Amino acid sequence: MAAAGAPDGMEEPGMDTEAETVATEAPARPVNCLEAEAAAGAAAEDSGAARGSLQPAPAQPPGDPAAQASVSNGEDAGGGAGRELVDLKIIWNKTKHDVKFPLDSTGSELKQKIHSITGLPPAMQKVMYKGLVPEDKTLREIKVTSGAKIMVVGSTINDVLAVNTPKDAAQQDAKAEENKKEPLCRQKQHRKVLDKGKPEDVMPSVKGAQERLPTVPLSGMYNKSGGKVRLTFKLEQDQLWIGTKERTEKLPMGSIKNVVSEPIEGHEDYHMMAFQLGPTEASYYWVYWVPTQYVDAIKDTVLGKWQYF
């Protein structure tokens, strides 16, 4: 006799549950070699696409105006756009350089520009326009106009050190010696000139002030012989002209070893000043009744900033 079975159309209890359990717990099918290589290739393409999205934009071609927009015609890099410019003629070592430069830039910035043109370090430069150009003032403040000539005097560091190291020692010795002496204006050789009194055409003085050299010669002074003397600063030739009634001495400023000065007792708004033209004090050329406001400008113009190196 056949065993009794389930009625037609009815499933035996538990069959679906067991099938689902078998399907869930069946181990993953092993991946063959071809499928593994395909997966690796797809990953590499995704990685390459990601890297490509991070690449920088291609550089502008050489002739592209956008690449040249930051380069101005004669202006400072990164400086002149939107600023008022003046045309300057910078003259150094008998060579003229025509440049455009912002009118509101300082003397210090002008030195940096000169450095970029000539290679002369700023500390070695003596920059002159109607006297020494102040580093902390703008070209507008010192009334520089378009077409102005800017004179530059300077030497290499090695040349300056070779010339000035002995000079520094000589200056220190001279100062130490002066401290031991009585004031210069009391010494007999100076007293005989000072006792004449002020020259009738002496220039006005401004006590406690420092001014740039005037555009005209300094006059109304005496020399050690009591004769009238005038000083003319020829900046373009880098010369000091010492003029008397008899003749005019034209001295290269680089030949002047030192400049000393001292206020005149009882007339402290005037100085007596000497230019050292040789190796000893005997070579001093004395000038009396120099207005005090020009003393520092004379020293800076003749000796330059590098005198302290």
UniProtKB/Swiss-Prot annotation:
Compositionally biased region (Low complexity): 35-57
Chain intervals for the UniProt region annotation (Disordered): 1-80, 171-204
Reading the lineage from the top rank, the first entry is Eukaryota
Pfam families xref list: PH_UBFD1_C (PF25343), ubiquitin (PF00240)
Q: Which InterPro entries match?
A: UBFD1 (IPR039120), Ubiquitin-like_dom (IPR000626), Ubiquitin-like_domsf (IPR029071), Ubiquitin_CS (IPR019954)
Q: What does this protein do?
A: May play a role as NF-kappa-B regulator.
Q: What is this protein called?
A: Ubiquitin domain-containing protein UBFD1
**Which organism does this record belong to?**
Homo sapiens (Human)
List the gene name. UBFD1
